Every structure is written in structure tokens, then in C-alpha cells.
């Protein structure tokens, strides 16, 4: 590691002491300094760029959108299912589709002017979403948000709102008939799986590295009922970090790893 997170004097004191007592060689230290300076030399501030109060926000937004798109990874695409035909009617499943994750937590979080949810992006792209599912999930997301907004006493390091960066998944086992109805009335199904991610910790196993019971039910039953109707299913992963996929990757026809795509 050539660069540590700045902010405290203690690491600086440790490095100086390490060089003085011989635990760290000056050659090793100079090598790290060289790499950091090399990185700085490549920055735009070192190439004549001047700060201004009127950045080209439209160009920056277009660049952010292009980078997000180019960074996505198509993990599976049986019989070239994706891209979806323009104007298709989509049954959009998954709470994260209606409250999508733009970035991570902690130091990976940045201020965002807005967040374009996956549902909104699809509609702007000319696709038609199931109004039934849109209404159902919108109410569910509002209810989940209320759990945080109406309980400020739960805001601290250990309680609900600090640890809750992703909307919980809706339990479709209590409304299984909706899946069959959507399989009849929609052209395809998209399922969105979401996971938060931040620094200084690994994933828990149950319900984090592995799918939750609600997510398993959703993928299995949406896939089986849409396939029975001769229609295809894709899973979009709005995640950052590792997840177990081997147990369910054969269910959908396509899997797109969208990562955390930012505000656009």
C-alpha cells in the first residue's frame, strides 16, 4: 500500500519512527512516494486545469452515464435475449428496481443531485412497465422508508437506519397469483436484486452473500411461471461486492451485473 487514508498524525509518526529505528528502509519509503507522485502527475490539476464555479454539468452527466453503462458486465445471455426489444411491456420485480442504489456507504458515498431508479430509466427508455407491479412496489418502498423516517430514535451505529442502506425485499409468496397474472399480461420479466456495500467489513452469509428467502422465491417462481408462458426472464444485479450465484444462475435467461451505476 502506497497511500493510507489521510486525516490522522499517528501514521505519519509511525513511518518516521520506523525509518529512524530501521524497521522501514528509506528505499521502500521512496518507492511508495515515487508511485504517489507519479499518480499526482497524471491528474488534470497538473495539466493546466483550472478550478471554476461553472462546470459543464450536462457533459459531466453524459460522461457519468456512459461510464456506468460501459462498466456493466453481461454475465449470461441465453439466445441473445438482451438487449430487450424497444417498446416491450416489462413486469419489473424487486424493490430495488423502484429504489435503486447509486453508490456505497461511508467513504464510497458521494452527494448526488438525483438518482435515476431503474424503473424510471426503463420508462425514459421507451419501455412500458406493469402498472400493477409499479403501484405495489411503490407503496411497499414508501412503507419501508417510513420505518426510517418515523423512528429517529433508531438512528445510531447499531440500530435500523444506520445499517439499513437497501430496501428489504417484498414477500411475493403472499401474493403468488400476481406472478401468474403478470406472466400472461407482460412480454418479459426483469428481476432486480440489490445489496449495499461499504468499507471495513465483509458480507454476512445469510441474506447478504446468499439470497434472502424472499429473493429466492421471487427468482424461482417468476422464472418458472414466465417460462411456462413462453416468456423470458432477466436478473439485474444492483450490487457491489461478491454474492453467491451458483445456486440460482440457471433460473433466468440473462444476468446483468450493473454494479452501483451512479446518479444517472
Regions found by a protein language model. Give the residues of each.
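C-terminal non-catalytic regions of proteins with extracellular/luminal or membrane-system context
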Residues: 11-24, 58, 62-264
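Flexible, acidic loop-helix segments that line cofactor/substrate-binding pockets
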Residues: 45-60
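Hydrophobic faces of well-ordered beta-strands that scaffold small-molecule active sites
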Residues: 2-5, 233-235
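Long, well-ordered, tryptophan-enriched scaffold segments
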Residues: 7-8, 14-47
Amino acid at each position: 500500500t502506497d497511500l493510507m487514508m489521510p486525516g490522522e498524525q499517528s501514521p505519519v509518526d509511525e513511518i518516521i519512527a520506523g525509518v529512524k529505528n530501521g524497521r522501514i528502509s528509506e528505499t521502500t519509503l521512496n518507492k511508495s512516494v515515487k508511485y504517489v507522485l507519479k499518480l499526482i502527475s497524471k491528474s488534470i490539476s497538473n495539466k493546466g486545469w483550472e478550478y471554476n464555479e461553472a462546470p459543464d454539468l450536462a457533459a459531466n452527466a453524459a460522461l457519468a452515464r456512459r461510464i456506468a453503462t460501459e462498466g456493466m458486465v453481461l454475465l449470461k445471455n441465453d439466445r441473445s435475449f438482451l438487449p430487450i426489444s424497444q417498446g416491450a411491456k416489462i413486469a419489473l420485480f424487486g424493490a430495488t428496481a423502484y429504489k435503486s442504489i447509486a453508490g456505497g456507504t461511508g467513504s464510497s458515498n458521494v452527494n448526488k443531485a438525483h438518482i435515476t431508479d431503474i424503473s424510471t430509466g426503463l420508462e425514459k427508455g421507451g419501455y412500458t412497465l406493469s402498472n400493477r407491479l409499479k403501484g405495489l412496489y411503490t407503496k411497499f418502498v414508501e412503507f419501508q422508508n417510513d420505518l426510517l423516517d418515523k423512528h429517529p430514535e433508531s438512528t445510531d451505529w447499531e440500530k435500523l437506519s444506520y445499517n439499513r442502506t437497501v430496501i428489504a425485499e417484498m414477500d411475493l409468496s403472499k401474493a403468488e397469483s400476481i406472478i401468474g397474472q403478470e406472466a400472461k399480461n407482460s412480454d418479459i420479466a426483469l428481476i432486480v436484486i440489490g445489496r449495499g456495500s461499504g468499507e471495513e467489513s465483509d458480507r454476512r452469509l445469510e441474506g447478504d452473500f446468499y439470497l434472502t428467502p424472499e429473493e429466492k422465491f421471487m427468482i424461482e417462481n417468476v422464472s418458472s411461471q414466465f417460462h411456462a408462458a413462453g416468456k423470458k426472464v432477466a436478473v439485474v444485479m444492483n450490487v457491489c461486492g461478491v454474492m453467491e450465484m451458483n445456486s440460482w444462475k440457471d433460473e433466468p435467461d440473462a444476468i446483468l451485473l450493473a454494479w452501483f451505476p451512479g446518479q444517472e
